[in-house]
Amino acid sequence: PVCHKNKPIKIKNTFNPDGAGTVIKQDVSNPQSKAIKGISSINDTSLITVQGLGMVGVIGVNYRIFKALAKNGISVFLVSQASSENSTSIGVRNADADLACEVLNEEFVKEIEMGEISPIQAEKDLATVAIVGENMKHTPGIAGKLFGTLGRNGINVIACAQGGSESYISFVVENKSLRKSLNVVHDSFFLSEYQVLNLFICGVCTVGGSLIEQIHSQ
């Protein structure tokens, strides 16, 4: 009701009643605020890709995909499609992956038999990470900074998606890379430009001793 009537909600801390609190409202855009407001993740992701040259230029392929999944109660939280139209990737929970593959293989059984679409399988044990921020659409270079950070840290991005509202970017990585992804993305967007690093040096030989003297003289 408050959303439809455009009424702001103010949340106060009972242990700190004099604090400013948090205001939730519809219009929160502020050109001066940070582009990224938060990072979220889903650690039980399976990626299912429907692909084949028989999809190119064919109307209704995605409709059939989502209709078949919805009919079987399978929720999709990520969609990524190439501009060439020869593949569509969807993210589902690991628990839904086998059923999703089964219903999609049944839906496209004729196309698979004719070789127009490849047999549909799931890539399991992945994780989805999303960065969210209202000011992303006003800030150039967010995607470049994000994927540059991941690349420099040796994290492979399996799939990615961005909404037309430009308020979020989602990407899929291996589950083992989830914690590292969250850490490096957080450091890149939320820490200051200058960071304090801890350097550990072992050894007392000539090279090690000279290095320690140089550091001490700085």
Q: Where are the regions a protein language model picked out?
A:
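C-terminal catalytic "cap/lid" subdomain
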Residues: 1-195
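Ubiquitous "structural anchor" signal
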Residues: 2, 141, 211-217
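Glycine-rich adenosine-cofactor-binding loop
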Residues: 197-216
